[in-house]
Structure formats: C-alpha cells, structure tokens
Amino acid sequence: MTEHLERNKKNVLEFYDLMFNQCKAAEAFEKYGGAVLIQHNPSVPDGAETVIEHFKGMEEVYPGKRAHFVRVIAEGNYVVVHVHTEWPGERDGASIDIFRLDDNGKIVEHWDVMQVVPEQSANDNTMF
C-alpha cells in the first residue's frame, strides 16, 4: 500500500513540476496522463489537449511563474497538493489541487481551489 501511495505522490509532483515550472505540458501528459482527463475547474474543459493549450497561454502571460509544493497527502488513488504559487507581476497564490490516479498511477481527474495571498491578514498565520 505504501509503495502505491508514494508512487502516486511522485507522479503527481513530477507532473505538476513539468506542467507548471518547466512549461512542458505535453511531456507531462505523455508521461503521467491517463487515457482521459476529467477536469472540475470550470474554466478548463475536459481532456489533455485543452489543458495543454491552457498552460501554453499561461506561459505567455506569466513567464517565470513558479509552484512550490508545501504539502502532499495521498490516500487511495487520490493525491492532494497544497501549493504556493509565484505569479510574476501579480500577488502570490495559494491553492489546493486534488488528483485522482488510475491503478497504473496515471492522472485521470483533477479539482482545484485557488486564492490570492492577501497583502494583510486578519491573523498572524500564513496561508502555508
């Protein structure tokens, strides 16, 4: 069981790094994407090709963007990643991405929630 969870965490982190940090979305899907991708982000249609195009556009608008992985949690076929995102020219972001993987460790489903890190907070805690 532990090997399965560690493999899934590794696959998701490598997928995310290729997609976001290295700007190699097509390679990320080739290595880690399943036969289908069910997308729950309302701004992005289902399927690898639409996500690849979405990330190509993001690369042009935010060159030098960077994702830092804060926490990674795996249970069953799900991996949850807490991410600190640097957006050049914009405020940083905090996000939670949830991935479902198939039995072969390939990514087949994705959810995310994102928010901007505010300049001031009502408490002394960080978002990370």
Name these PLM-found stretches.
Residues 1-128:
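C-terminal and inter-domain tail/linker signature
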